């Protein structure tokens, strides 16, 4: 239901689906955690993202999304990092951060609404508390990066302004 909802949301909001290649000739954003393989005498890599293709498609179509597999050869000591996963990557030409957050809220709300409407039985089988999901409504609370740094530092974490939050 989640995958169906993602596709339905983007299709009903005039996003164009463009699948990106799974084999690519280079890394995305300068990273080096790639799965490489011989590809007719050259090295090809399993794609980490369809972002490069998505950005070009967004400039052509205005709104675009890619939904496909991603591969990352990251060595991790946690179970939170997968080497293979599926990722949805929407791109909107000339979209600012506030519009981006609005689209994210709309997407998450749409998915939750459909899952709660069509998959309540499955949520109960998985022993999920649907009351928490029902409370997840828009607008979502928002804070600035600076406010977040202050909250983290006030709660005993040490993080400098400009640092990544990490995972």
Model-based region annotation:
Residues 56, 77, 98-100, 153:
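Short acidic, gly/pro-rich beta-turn/loop elements at beta-sheet edges
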Residues 2-6, 100-104, 144:
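Hydrophobic (often cysteine-bearing) scaffold residues that line and stabilize catalytic clefts
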Residues 1-93:
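Class II aminoacyl-tRNA synthetase-like tRNA-binding/catalytic domains
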Residues 53-56, 83, 100-106, 122-128:
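Low-complexity, flexible helical/coil segments
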Residues 93-101, 137-141:
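Generic alpha-helical structural element
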Residues 61, 88, 96-117:
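His/Asp/Glu-rich mid-to-C-terminal helical/loop segments that flank catalytic regions of hydrolases
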Residues 20, 27-34, 106-167:
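Metal-assisted phosphate- and nucleotidyl-transfer catalytic regions
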